[in-house]
Amino acid sequence: MIRGFFLILLFLLLAFFSENYVRSLEKLKEEITVRSELKGVEIQLYGEKGLEWRIQGKTLTYADNQVVINEPVIRTQDYTITSEKLYMNKKTRKGRLEGNVEIRGPNLYLRTTNAYIDLVKNISWGYNELILRKDTNVIKGRGFKIFFKPFKVQINEVESIHTTS
């Protein structure tokens, strides 16, 4: 009788410790995220017509389909986009540009704080204040959308337009 009681007690203790051990392993499994970091990177994205985008950066961090590129330089045709950081979803190829975003091209310069980019649809857009220089015009406004193929610029709210010679 006492022997049976001790066997039951031993079984319950083993079950208790086993359950705690399994729970601790599950917590470890949830906390582990595999991250990769590369330095001096270049990514080339191809579409139907060949090379469409070239992205260079100081460092690239990759975790859970999210790519973070520090000091990205993004090029398509004659246009170059720079910022402090690019956060991009690897699957959708959509991203967020943060910090000192600049878009340059033939007779075009746009500067804003943050913007978004869709590398599949070939567009970039933003909602913050901006300065746009196009030919001899300087436009201050808020919010924009740039279509790269074919090239077209839309400004949502124009605050002022200045013409320089």
UniProtKB/Swiss-Prot annotation:
Q: Does the keyword Signal apply?
A: yes
What are the record keywords, sorted?
A: Signal
Give the residue range of the signal peptide. 1-17
Entry's InterPro entries?
LipoPS_assembly_LptC-rel (IPR010664)
At the top level, the lineage of the source is Bacteria
Kindly provide the name given to this protein in its UniProt entry: Uncharacterized protein aq_2172
